[in-house]
């Protein structure tokens, strides 16, 4: 499998639809949760789809798609943190400081491709994209599955995956829910899709 990572532009909307399926990925969210909070499940799923499509049409691209050939097999939402207002309404995820960070806030991987390195490839590509955009750091909000009573809802990723990619915990307001960051001002040392690190390793972003 050779993954190619591409930004979600309007011409790739049908690829996202195919990946998410009729249910809109996670409970019909259509990646609206961090934008509008729990209101996403109080309205028809089609309304979330329409709202997120408007985000895509308006631009800039709100995330990255991983392709295996012509098939989209993975997705991550990647934006400046301020584009996701509901993060600051989440008690455990409020801002650590005023740094102009970007947020890697959720993932979705197609069945049959899970546990095959798709998430790691998306993380590696996201680091490159955020750095080129001028972000000081890339932030994420994973679940620490090594902690008791951690949730099984892992759409934000797992802490161990991000740790392998070089992210460090900068806040932990509950044992199972750290805020992790990768400093993008340091010399570039981007992990590949397997988590291996080195200054020359890249995941193609087209």
Located regions from the model:
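Conserved N-terminal entry element of GNAT/NAT acetyltransferase domains
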Residues: 1-35, 192-193, 197, 206
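Conserved GNAT acetyl-CoA-binding A-motif
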Residues: 123, 130-152
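Conserved acyl-donor/pantetheine-binding loop and adjacent beta-alpha core of acyl/acetyltransferases
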Residues: 58, 67, 71-110, 114, ...
């Amino acid at each position: 499998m050779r993954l190619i990572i591409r930004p979600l532009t309007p011409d790739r909307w049908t690829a996202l639809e195919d990946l998410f399926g009729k249910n809109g990925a996670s409970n019909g969210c259509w990646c609206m949760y961090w934008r509008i909070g729990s209101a996403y499940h109080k309205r028809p799923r089609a309304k979330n789809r329409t709202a997120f499509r408007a985000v895509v049409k308006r631009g800039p691209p709100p995330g990255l798609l991983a392709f295996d050939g012509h098939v989209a097999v993975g997705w991550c939402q990647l934006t400046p943190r301020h584009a996701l207002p509901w993060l600051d309404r989440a008690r455990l995820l409020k801002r650590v400081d005023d740094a102009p960070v970007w947020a890697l806030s959720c993932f979705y991987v197609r069945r049959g491709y899970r546990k095959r390195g798709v998430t790691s490839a998306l993380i590696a590509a996201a680091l490159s994209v955020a750095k080129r955009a001028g972000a000081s750091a890339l932030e994420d909000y994973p679940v620490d599955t090594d902690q008791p009573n951690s949730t099984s809802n892992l759409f934000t990723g797992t802490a161990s995956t991000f740790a392998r990619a070089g992210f460090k915990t900068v806040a932990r307001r509950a044992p199972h829910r750290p805020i992790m960051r990768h400093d993008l001002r340091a010399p570039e040392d981007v992990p590949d899709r397997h988590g291996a690190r080195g200054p020359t390793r890249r995941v193609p972003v087209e």
